[in-house]
Amino acid sequence: RKGNAKLLFIAHREEILKPSIACLRQGLTDPNFGQLAVGNYHAARSEHLFMSIQTFNSQKFWEKMDPFYYDMIIVDEFHHAAAKGYQKLLNWFHPKILLGLTATPERMDGKNILNYFGGHMAAEIRIRDDIERRLLCRLHNFCIDDPVSLSNIKWTGGHYDIEELENVYTGEGALASQRARAIIQALERYTADMRDVKALGFCVSKKHAHFMADYFNRQGIKALALDADSPKDVRNAARQKLESGDITIIFVVDLFNEGVDIPAVNTVLFLRPTNSMTIFLQQLGRGLRLFPEKDCLTVLDFVAQANRKYDFASRYASLLGKNHVVIKKEIQDGFPHVPKGCSIQLEEIAARHVLENINSRLRKNEFYMDMVKELASATGHIPTLEEFFKATAIHPHTFYNEKH
């Protein structure tokens, strides 16, 4: 407030920087606080700077600054900080306070971002705690049988082959249309009034997103498709149409995963498998923001017969704070320990798929040995632990904290 302390705020998207500077201006009751350095915004001063990591690197900003210039550096979405693009920032500057913000501190590649903070978190609150404290809205999660089986889809590097997923989700045969029709039926079945739905549907590819939008529009449900390459004005216009109710759903790929708030979103559809809990939680978080006209978030999670290496249980564990062994009992008992006011319901066939998957993964010795053999065959050498975690998308916490 006294204007003496110098601040550098770093994020990787303009959509994060703009609300961040607005929030601090409001909190400090100073409408002129800070300057943006991102895209077409060029800052004239550096005392209180809100800069994208891309601008930081392209301008070689560190070369212009004393390492001790900033009193505080805030890095949003800090789970990105282990990436190469953040190393100049973190190694050059020596602020009095380094503050990292993230909803997903566990990286799937096993790299530990806590090393920048003496190995511990200063403060931590998880999604379950946020919901129970009413900092995020309640959710009703419906796990729906997916008519498409993924058991024969190619699996490499800890995930399904994107091209094969796209083909099965958008193919010219009857199966793709059957799946799209089942998605609409589920939306109608599990939402109170389609006229009130403001939804995001997360897709596997651009082609998949456009296929879904086209199908919905043909059925009289207004929809748009967006991806990371969509122009900013197109994205903004789509967001406004969703908020105003002019459209019902936006199908997206590689967009709205993180850092972008659309509080009016009241329905999230997971239309593709993801083995990354970081991405899953980020996408789920797009619908958890509080909003005056939103009582709860409806989550439609389409569960297919999966490759046995796919990890269903982690998404439930992230909401319940339980390990895979306990999750099996939670499913069998109807999820009695979800946050107050929330629910998780599995359709009969979906529940069978999930339990079969969990049982397979709980046979850990056999499962892990198969994974090691597969990686050794593909790479020509026995993988290190780091290589194993990165290739399989198994988090170290899961590996060390479960019986196997």
Give a label for each model feature:
Residues 179, 189, 312-404:
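Long, largely alpha-helical accessory region at the distal end of helicase-like NTP-driven motors
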